[in-house]
Curated annotation (Swiss-Prot):
Stretch forming the signal peptide: none
Full protein name: Isoprenyl transferase
Co-factor(s): Mg(2+)
Entry's Gene Ontology molecular function annotations: ditrans,polycis-polyprenyl diphosphate synthase [(2E,6E)-farnesyl diphosphate specific] activity; magnesium ion binding
Entry-linked PANTHER family: DEHYDRODOLICHYL DIPHOSPHATE SYNTHASE 2, DEHYDRODOLICHYL DIPHOSPHATE SYNTHASE FAMILY MEMBER
GO biological process entries: polyprenol biosynthetic process
Task of the protein: Catalyzes the condensation of isopentenyl diphosphate (IPP) with allylic pyrophosphates generating different type of terpenoids.
Length: 250
């Protein structure tokens, strides 16, 4: 995104109603690859290589526009059911993107946080995630959150197991259990719930993503497939968000 476009579009946004936390379901890589396979110079098992090329521009654009937390649904618990070739490609891309984004995150004082069942990931990927998280942990004003091996139902199961453990060991009482207490056991306990959830690829579902956290989140679905998603598509989503009236169930 050019500096001119950033300046013009930033001026068109209302800073008072800017979403603080934007989450994105990055869907459509495989459909995009089927449509463009003949023109692709890099052969990919599923198109994720081309989806990954979009990431740096979207990440930079989101934070330059004033977004404080950007959460990306990178790999679901169900994705392990895909072919070994596709899963291996995704893990390889995670390694590459973590290496590529680290200097940007450090330079711009952005913290990396990963959510999900990380213990089920390959040990080398766990180590790299821990390294990048450690090198950016002193930053807290802005955060890039990657959901890796994440599922909303799985998160709740893990949270309730931890809560049950504390109940049994009398660290908490049954009377103390509340929505706010449960929230403290979630992967996202230290970040606000999303204000805006964007889904690319046109599918009208949330795909087991942040089920607890998106109770009052504004949803925006675009038919644009993820590898075609540009900064101006992100801006369109934010502008649509700013024209809505958020009532939080009231």
């Amino acid at each position: 995104m050019s500096l001119t476009l950033k300046q013009a579009d930033q001026a068109s946004l209302s800073m008072q109603s800017l979403p603080k936390h934007v989450a994105i379901i990055m869907d459509g890589n495989r459909r995009w690859y089927r449509q463009h396979q003949a023109q692709c110079s890099i052969k990919s098992s599923s198109g994720h290589y081309y989806g990954a090329k979009v990431l740096p521009n979207i990440i930079e654009s989101a934070f330059s526009l004033g977004i404080e937390v950007l959460t990306l649904f990178a790999f679901s618990t169900e994705n392990f059911l895909r072919s070994a070739e596709e899963v291996a490609e995704l893990f390889s891309l995670f390694h590459a993107q973590l290496d590529e984004q680290l200097p940007y995150l450090i330079e711009n004082k952005i913290r990396l946080r990963c959510i999900g069942n990380l213990l089920a990931l390959p040990p080398d990927l766990q180590q790299q995630i821990a390294k990048v998280a450690s090198e950016t942990q002193r930053h807290g004003m802005r955060e890039l959150v990657l959901a890796i091996n994440y599922g909303g139902k799985d998160e709740l199961v893990r949270a309730f197991k931890k809560l049950h453990h504390d109940l049994v060991n009398k660290k908490i009482s049954l009377d103390s259990v509340s929505e706010e207490l449960i929230r403290l056991y979630l992967d996202t306990s230290e970040i606000p719930d999303p204000d805006l959830l964007i889904r690319t690829g046109g599918e009208m579902r949330v795909s087991n993503f942040l089920l607890w956290q998106i109770a009052y989140t504004e949803l925006y679905v675009t038919d644009v497939l993820w590898p075609d998603f540009k900064p101006y598509h992100l801006l369109d989503a934010i502008k649509a968000y700013q024209h809505r009236s958020r009532r939080g169930g009231k």
